[in-house]
C-alpha cells in the first residue's frame, strides 16, 4: 500500500494564502496621510505635509543636482512641426534623452505638455517612430502617437525616455544565460535595487520629469506657466505622481491607470515599477489625488481595460469627485472619458481638455 500525506488547500483554510492576513492590515480609511476633508486652510496644510512625506516615500527627490550639459542630437523637419532630440543630465548618475515637438507657424511662447509613455519600446512609440528609429506616418499600438497629436493641437510636447525603457535599459551582457544566470527585466531589476536603497522607480521618474521641467523653463519660446501632463498606463502613474509632487503642472490627463490599488495594482500582476514601499500610509489612490486638487484632471478609461477594471475606475472617480474635489469646491474640475475600448489612448476629450485648461 502506497502511503501519502493529506493535502490541504486554501479552499479549506483561506489563511494558507500569505496575502489573506495582509489584507486585514490594509485599512486605507485609517491611513495617517489619508485625505482629511475639512476647510480649505486645513487642506492646504495637509497638502504641504503630505507632499513632503510622499517625497520621502517614493525616494530620490533629494539626489544631487548637476549641470544639464544639454546636447541637441538631431532636428527633423516634419512639415507641420519640428522634432528635436535632446540629451540632458538629470542628476549626477543619470542622463535622459527626450524629444521636443514644436508646432510651426504658431505664436511663441507655446503652452507645453509633458507626454509620458507607458510600457513598450519607449518614447519613440508616442512621437511617430518605430522601435528601430524609422519614421511612420500612421499611429500604431495603444499609445496612438499621442505626442504627435498633442503637437498638432498646438502644444510644445516634451516626451522623455522614461527610466527602464527604450534607450534607458540596463546592460546585462556580463550575465551568462547558458549557465543559468537569468537575465532580468530592467524595470524589475531597477525596482528591486530602488527598494533596497529605500526608494522606488517612480521616485526616479518623478525626479527626471521635474528636472526636465527645470530645463525647459530656460527656453523663451515655451510658456511653462501653461504646463500640462498626459500619460498612459505606467505613464499615467508617472503623470499622477509628477502632478502630486510638482504644482507647476497645471492640468493633467491620466489614461489607463486611475482605478484603485485594491481593485487593480494588487488584484493581478503588474510591473514592479508600479509599486512604492509604504504607500499604504497615504490611503487609496483617491486620497493621493488630493495633492493635485483643485487642479483640473481628466481620467481616460476603456470599458474593457483588463488591468485597470472599470468598476474600480468608477469607484475611484465617484470618491474623488464627491470627497476630494468637492471639498475644494471644484467638483467640476475632475472629468472622465469612459470609452468603449481596451487599454489604450482614446483622445476624444483629452486633447480639447488640455486646450481648454492651458490655452
What are these regions (language model features)?
Residues 236-247:
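Short glycine-enriched nucleophile-adjacent loop
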Residues 93-96, 104-112, 119-122:
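Proline/glycine-enriched tight loop/beta-turn segments at coil->beta junctions
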Residues 292, 299-301:
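Short beta-strand/loop motif that positions the catalytic acidic residue
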Residues 1-82, 90-91:
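N-terminal targeting or regulatory segments adjacent to alpha/beta-hydrolase or S9 domains
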Residues 188-189, 193-199, 206, 211-212, ...:
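Mobile cap/lid helix-loop segments that gate and shape the active-site cleft of serine hydrolases
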Residues 221-233:
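Alpha/beta-hydrolase fold nucleophile elbow
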Residues 108, 116-210, 217-218, 263-268:
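Cap/lid segment of the alpha/beta-hydrolase catalytic domain
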Amino acid at each position: 500500500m502506497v502511503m501519502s500525506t493529506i493535502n490541504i488547500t486554501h479552499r479549506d483554510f483561506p489563511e494558507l494564502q500569505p496575502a489573506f492576513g495582509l489584507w486585514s492590515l490594509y485599512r486605507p480609511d485609517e491611513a495617517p496621510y489619508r485625505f482629511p476633508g475639512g476647510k480649505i486652510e486645513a487642506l492646504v496644510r495637509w497638502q504641504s505635509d503630505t507632499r513632503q512625506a510622499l517625497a520621502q516615500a517614493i525616494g530620490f527627490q533629494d539626489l544631487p543636482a548637476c549641470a544639464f550639459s544639454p546636447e541637441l542630437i538631431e532636428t527633423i523637419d516634419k512639415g507641420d512641426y519640428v522634432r528635436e532630440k535632446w540629451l540632458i543630465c538629470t542628476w549626477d548618475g543619470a542622463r535622459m534623452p527626450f524629444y521636443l515637438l514644436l508646432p510651426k507657424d504658431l505664436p511663441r511662447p507655446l503652452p507645453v505638455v509633458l507626454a509620458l509613455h507607458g510600457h513598450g519600446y519607449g518614447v519613440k512609440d508616442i512621437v511617430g517612430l518605430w522601435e528601430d528609429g524609422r519614421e511612420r506616418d500612421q499611429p500604431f499600438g495603444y499609445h496612438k502617437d499621442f505626442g504627435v497629436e498633442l503637437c498638432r493641437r498646438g502644444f510644445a510636447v516634451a516626451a522623455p525616455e522614461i527610466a527602464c525603457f527604450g534607450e534607458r535599459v540596463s546592460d546585462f551582457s556580463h550575465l551568462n544565460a547558458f549557465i543559468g544566470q537569468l537575465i532580468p527585466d530592467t524595470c524589475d531589476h531597477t525596482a528591486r535595487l530602488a527598494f533596497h536603497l529605500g526608494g522606488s522607480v517612480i521616485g526616479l521618474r518623478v525626479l527626471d520629469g521635474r528636472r526636465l521641467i527645470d530645463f525647459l523653463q530656460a527656453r523663451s519660446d515655451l510658456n511653462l506657466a501653461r504646463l500640462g501632463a498626459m500619460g498612459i498606463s505606467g505613464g499615467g502613474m508617472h503623470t499622477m505622481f509628477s502632478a502630486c509632487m510638482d504644482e507647476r503642472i497645471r492640468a493633467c490627463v491620466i489614461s489607463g491607470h486611475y482605478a484603485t490599488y485594491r481593485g487593480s495594482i494588487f488584484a493581478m500582476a503588474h510591473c514592479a515599477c508600479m509599486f512604492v514601499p509604504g504607500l499604504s500610509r497615504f490611503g487609496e489612490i483617491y486620497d493621493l489625488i488630493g495633492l493635485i486638487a483643485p487642479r483640473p484632471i481628466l481620467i481616460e478609461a476603456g470599458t474593457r481595460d483588463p488591468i485597470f477594471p472599470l468598476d474600480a475606475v468608477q469607484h475611484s472617480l465617484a470618491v474623488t469627485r464627491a470627497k476630494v474635489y468637492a471639498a475644494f469646491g471644484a467638483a467640476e474640475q475632475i472629468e472622465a472619458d469612459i470609452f468603449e475600448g481596451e487599454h489604450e489612448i482614446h483622445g476624444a476629450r483629452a486633447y480639447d481638455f488640455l486646450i481648454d485648461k492651458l490655452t
